[in-house]
Amino acid sequence: MYETVLLTGITGNLGSWLAVEMLQRGTNVLALMRDANSKAATRRLDRVLEITGGSDLKDKIEIIHGDISQKGLGLKVQAKKLKRLCRIIHCAACTKFLEDDGKSHQMMNVRGTLNVLELASRLSLPVVHVSSAYIAGKRTGVVKEDEIDVGQSFNNIYESTKCRSEMLVHKWAQMNSLPAVVLRPSIVLGESLHGKTVRFTSLYDYLRVLTLIVPRMGKHWIRIAAHPDVTKNIIPVDYFAKASSYIIDRGVSGTYHITNPAPLTMKDFGEIFSRLLGLSRYRLVHVDSFLRRKPNEIEMLIQKATAVYNPYLLSEPSFDRTHTDSALADGGIQLPAMDSSYFGKLLDYACSVRWR
């Protein structure tokens, strides 16, 4: 008999690809979706399955109406459906970096996780929690997988609430003596074969601004406030899905950095995208140097449009992968090359669907 999991966040970028990978491995999915209208839920699911290549697996997915912000996830399903579950996989989250009051982050990332854990306790089920490598916040140096709160400060409310939610998971596992797997992906972009993605967020916002501005630059030089030697830890979403699914199947509790062991530097990215976008008149400069001279009009546009991501161009820690490397040692799962070919596919796909 095939295993069945309860999955939150199936229409998100991580949850959608992870769901398809698990379906291909023989797992059935009970998908929690907020849509009160079943037709609307089906349409949203159909869209992501078409993008992720999982349309032929749809009969192994059952949609159930619920809401992680509610007690018991707002579930009104028959008890026998929940009894056949082998685990809960929690992917749903508010991923916006900026929000004035932070209510959505608190409700989704903190309260939502607590509600998932309470249901898992009631059903005595193991939990898989998709966190983020960037709960490290403003830390520098090496971040180990067993470290969570070491007094770090954060760049935004997304990081801080994801850190709080992960702390809840570890505390829950200790108190209930139930297994918990925590997955910490870094920056996750489109899949490696065709560059496909379900959502255009994160680095995509920055790339879209550049694609709009470069044709208007003429002979102007621009400076970009970014430390050339700072790394940007990027992985394709299909690597995230394969690595995560393999780790989940092993069933060994722990925290796993699903990250790039050899991330590119900002200088590397500058060279790649200068070729892809035809951006030849640019310089990466340290922020203090950037601020010493008034930005020109194009520099100002880039800064304003991408301000929320600026901290990530200036600093990044190194993510230790001891647990992940051990777990994947016999899995044959390799990180695809992060090169011009890959990033070219991302841009081609984004442009082909008009970034939506």
How does the language model describe each region?
Residues 1-87, 91-94:
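N-terminal Rossmann/SDR dinucleotide-binding element
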Residues 4-5, 30-33, 318-356:
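Amphipathic terminal alpha-helices
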Residues 86-90, 99-103, 107, 111-157, ...:
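Conserved Rossmann-fold NAD(P)-dependent oxidoreductase catalytic core, especially the SDR/UDP-sugar
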Residues 150, 194-195, 205-239, 243-246:
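A conserved pocket-lining segment of Rossmann-fold NAD(P)-dependent short-chain dehydrogenase/reductase
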Residues 153-186:
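Active-site Tyr-X1-5-Lys
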Residues 191-204, 246-256:
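Glycine/proline-rich active-site loop of Rossmann-fold NAD(P)-dependent oxidoreductases
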Residues 212-225, 289-334:
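A hydrophobic C-terminal alpha-helical subdomain
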Residues 243-308, 350-353:
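Mid/C-terminal beta-alpha module of Rossmann-like enzyme folds, strongest
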